[in-house]
């Protein structure tokens, strides 16, 4: 699959997730089979660009793979400036967020709140596309609610404005993440536009991945929450798509190595104070299917230093293996 002049190594993409798809997580997913990883969203408000959080989101020097940076906001001029700033800091693709359902984003008329204002969407898309010389993509939902599904017209508008790929989550904003994603809307959008369409929502297994690709005709898949605590899901899906067989479960020794490497990378990236705190949620995701881990997770969440976290994980896996 290509986005503009960029050839992805496969059609599996890591979805942008605030507080999750930082550089350590993106690098890990790329190592375990993802074809591209989209960064956490960056606000178009220039007053926030110099904050520690935004600075961490802009670290791209030496990063593996294609560097896709997501921006969020509702002001066309500020969105254009955010796109330019991102490109100056290493972005090779700009992704526009019109899919985030979070209240704190929507109350600023950003994310999926924009689906109620097609005229504003058009202004934003044109402004961003005209502001940069890299491909611009769009991530969105099927509509504001079930009575106001407008993804088909938004997709056609996006293509007309020069958007070079469209990721569509199979839920409305009102659905948040409740219920099941639907794929009929994605199928209809794929039939209506000529730009690449990326299916998103509840793609949590190799079998589901193949079904969604075949049912919708989508060019690629975008995977978010199912990769939390299971970044190797991308290689599992790719293996199944290529060979029609499922990979054996990773041995516990490899899961241990992945976790320890990820936690160490978080410590190094965020530092001694913030690193251990961010590591807690990732460890919880890794261990969510370990029946014996509930007590350990509570203990781990109280640990405040990097060395103690690593020692605790070593001890946990020693007990699991014994």
From Swiss-Prot:
GO molecular function, one term: FMN binding
UniProt cross-references to InterPro entries, sorted A to Z: Aldolase_TIM, DUS-like_FMN-bd, DUS_fam, DusB, DusB-like, tRNA-dHydroUridine_Synthase_C, tRNA_hU_synthase_CS
Keywords linked to the UniProt accession: Flavoprotein, FMN, NADP, Oxidoreductase, RNA-binding, tRNA processing, tRNA-binding
Enzyme Commission number, as recorded: 1.3.1.-
Catalytic reaction list: a 5,6-dihydrouridine in tRNA + NAD(+) = a uridine in tRNA + NADH + H(+); a 5,6-dihydrouridine in tRNA + NADP(+) = a uridine in tRNA + NADPH + H(+)
Cofactor(s) the protein needs: FMN
Enzyme class per UniProt: oxidoreductase
Pfam families the record matches: Dus
Positions bound to FMN: 16-18, 70, 139, 200-202, 224-225
Catalytic-site annotation from UniProt: 100
PANTHER family tied to this protein: TRNA-DIHYDROURIDINE(47) SYNTHASE [NAD(P)(+)]-LIKE
Function of the molecule: Catalyzes the synthesis of 5,6-dihydrouridine (D), a modified base found in the D-loop of most tRNAs, via the reduction of the C5-C6 double bond in target uridines.
Family: Belongs to the Dus family. DusB subfamily.
Protein name: tRNA-dihydrouridine synthase B
Gene (name only): dusB
